[in-house]
Amino acid sequence: MSHEFSPENTAVLFEAMKQEQHNRRRRVPMERRRRVVLACFNCKARKVRCDGANPCKACASNNLECTYPVKDEKEMDYSKDYFIDLSKRYKCLEYIVERLCSTKVSTYTTPSLIEVCNRISNQKSLLSSDVFSLNSESTNSQRDVDTLTQGALVCSQIQQDPTVVAEDTNNGINADASDQSVDEIMKLIGKIKVDSNGESRYIGASAGEAFVDSVQSELLVDPSFSELSAYSHTHHSYPPNEHDVNAVQKALSLLPPPEVSDFLIKSFYGHVQANFFFFHETLLRYRLNLIMSFQNPSVDPGFLCLLMMIFALGSMFAHMEIRSASNPFDNPGKQFFDTARLLLPQVIQQCKPSLVQASILMGLYLQSTLSQKSSYTYFGLSLSAAVANGLHRSCENPNIDPKTKELRNRLWWSVYTMDRLISIATGRPLSIADSECDAALPTVVPELEIEGSASNVHNIISMSKIAKIMGKTMEQLYGTVNYKKNPINIIESLRADLEEWKRSLPPFQILENLDAEDPLFRANVHLHMTYDQAIIIMSRPVLLHKMKNAKNSPRVDRINEDCILAARHLISLVHLLQNHSQLSCYSFFDYNYTFSSALVVLLHCVTEPCEEDDIAMQYAYSALDYMAEGNEAAKNCARVIRLFDAHLKGARSDGNGNTSQSGFMAWQRWIAEVSAKDEPEKLMSPYNKSIGGGRNSNSLTPNANLGADVSFFPTDDTSFLLDHSKLDDDLEKFASTLDPIKTTPDLANDSSLLNWANTDQGMDIEGSWLGNMHPTWLDYVCP
């Protein structure tokens, strides 16, 4: 039975109760079934009529003890769902009465409410304000707390700890009436206001305007009192200056011809908006057609800025529309992006939902560059604008139609999801708490569906739900206030949430059911990549613990195994996308997830090298090399992974090298040290030349193949926007430190590589290990 209150559920509940009463109805009334119900044991044994007296005539005449069986009444067998539904119905009706009558119903006892009903039944005409005024004296009576208000709390807790409910109930009964009215403060909630132009803005509960509105509604007779209403000002707009006009004209001149714009729009909606929502395609094409149909159109700068970003991102993913196409050139769509930046000041000044849409797309565009801080700033601007427009709250304003509400919800959950995913990837705090968001999840609205296009509403829902879990991971596992808690328990709880998310996926999103020809194939694969990434993020902190401790509890081993399997599986999904030409060299999540999983696999190779890891790394290198062709950030990730791999191969070779050869090297070193005491100049010179001087591949025995690994780092790459000479010097300096006489490479004292590391606070895992809760890649290199 559904728990939501609706007329349909009411009818179902009524029919269920009728059926239950019918099942309990006996064909013969209970009072007439005397021989079955009222016969004593003696009469029943002798099969004679019993008159039901105590004692009966038969027992009295025979001087026998007259005993009747205990009546076994059938207990009420209502289900838990029934009481939950009934409790919700009660709360809904109570809320309606409180809104209509402005009276706290829960402060009245049941006899008082019965008295109110009796009195108002005699009134021919009745106003809502008169309902409880007719029984004002009942407000002075003792006000009990109705047990029905406990609702699901009673059903779920009374079996576990009956004292909890009893204590809460007693506290409510003994509470002072004035204390019970404190929850009236909760009426001061945030609200969304819509002006005459249709622009919305959010007013939080702590704002002065919200308090003015409360005073106005509670104390004033006329709610349209002009002097107070003047406080509710609309957003002022300034006339455009010369720079603004020139920016609009430049954007209009950059609009591509219809054939090109149609191609770019198709590319954007097919690859960028697959798991998110930014703007409705039908509305976009309609407004674009209006602009193209007039010579000097009056254009909204916000929509024009959004249009430029759609064309910019469509240009980025254009190569995926033609599978045989090679990557075009660096920074595709840069002209559109630069023009959108010129328009952005006007869009910020307007602060409409178009600012939310344009700024989040700007952040996405910059994710494929090395301007990561700028990208994060655009994401923050997008979320702030969304909150300013009230997208994060449930909208009950009658001035906003249902379709607009649905589009607002879809946009909000896309912004929310992006905030969670980017915050996790960059290690930055979440921008908004879940407790502040009560906007409804998206739903399928037939009027908003596009004929001939696959609906991605379920993808938005699935991404929003897993983003919530990743947000919990950030708060509970990586939050600074949780270092004293047991992370193993937290990880297992989060892992259970992930499994529940996976079980709730609709059939067409299950990995085994995916079809490469489905328009949402890439989007659905991304859902499962995000699932694997969530496992990696929540279980990665125990990897170093696993390496440092030979003996671990089964719980730690299980979490470690989950992390390794998730990393391999994620790389296999990346390889799947690459095989079907669905891997984008400009997608942040494609290269970031590949980089994250490759780190885990390489770390596992140190302790337990296996063929599965070698295959996974081949796939990872292939994908990173492909994405590095047009993505500066991906190129950076590929460099770091190869540096990481080269060092770990050196560590493995030093640890697993030929014992005789290692002994020979130790003997030679000892001879040199002893002889140096007598003839330092004669003996130390050839020793330094043969052991410490040469840095070619032959001198790196037993790791003779290391030269090939280091050769992956080109020194003539001019497209890498970091300090190229410094990075390549770092790589050469790193290669020179790989001395075979060392059992562990000395990265800890390499100041050039320490620049990659961050200082982090440790935490206690199972009360015995102080590890790095936020491990950088250097922590994996030097476990």
UniProtKB/Swiss-Prot annotation:
Residues 40-66 bind DNA. Pfam families: Fungal_trans, Zn_clus. InterPro entries: Fungal_SecMet_Regulators (IPR051127), Transcription_factor_dom_fun (IPR007219), Zn2-C6_fun-type_DNA-bd_sf (IPR036864), Zn2Cys6_DnaBD (IPR001138). It is found in: Cytoplasm; Nucleus. SMART domains: Fungal_trans, GAL4. GO terms for cellular component: cytoplasm; nucleus. The keyword Aminoacyl-tRNA synthetase does not apply. One of its GO terms (biological process) is DNA-templated transcription. Keywords: Cytoplasm, DNA-binding, Metal-binding, Nucleus, Transcription, Transcription regulation, Zinc. GO terms for molecular function: DNA-binding transcription factor activity, RNA polymerase II-specific; RNA polymerase II cis-regulatory region sequence-specific DNA binding; sequence-specific DNA binding; zinc ion binding. PANTHER family: PROLINE UTILIZATION TRANS-ACTIVATOR (PTHR47424:SF6), REGULATORY PROTEIN GAL4 (PTHR47424). This is Uncharacterized transcriptional regulatory protein C3C7.04. The lineage of its organism: Eukaryota, Fungi, Dikarya, Ascomycota, Taphrinomycotina.
